[in-house]
Amino acid sequence: MKILGIGNAIVDVLCKVDDEFLIKNSLTKSTMKLIDEAEIKNLLSGLTIQDTISGGSVANSVVGLSQLGNRVGFIGKVNDDNLGQKYEDGLKKEKVNFLYKKNSESTPTGTCLI
C-alpha cells in the first residue's frame, strides 16, 4: 500500500425527491442539515433509494487515487449492518484496501442522504 487515508466512513444514499417532499420535511435545496437516526429513518420511509455509494471526503479521495493507479487503503469505522457491508463492498470494487473494525453497537453506519 502506497497511500493510506483515515476518515469517516459515510454511505451516500442517493434519492430523487421533488419540491413537495422538501417543503413537507422543512428541507432547503443546496444545504446541509445534521439529523439524528430517528429523522433519517423517517425521511427514508418516504423515499425510493436510487443507489448507495461508499463516501466520506477521505474515502472519496483515496478512491480517486486508486483510479489513477495508486495502491491505497482507508481506515474507517462502520457498523455490522447492511450499510456497513455495502460500504466495504463499494471500496473493494474500487480496489481500496479497507482496514476497519465493524462496530456491533446499536449505532448505525454513518449515512448521508443526497
Language-model segments: which ranges?
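Short secondary-structure boundary micro-motifs
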Residues: 5, 85, 96-100
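Glycine- and other small-residue-rich loops at beta-strand/loop junctions that grip anionic moieties
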Residues: 76-77, 102
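Glycine-rich phosphate/adenosyl-contacting loop at the front of the ribokinase-like
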Residues: 1-75, 93
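Short, electropositive alpha-helical surface patch
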Residues: 80, 84-93
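Short, basic and Ser/Thr-rich N-terminal targeting/leader segments
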Residues: 68, 107-109
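Short beta-strand scaffold segments in enzyme catalytic cores
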Residues: 111-114
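A glycine-rich helix N-cap at a beta->alpha junction
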Residues: 90-107
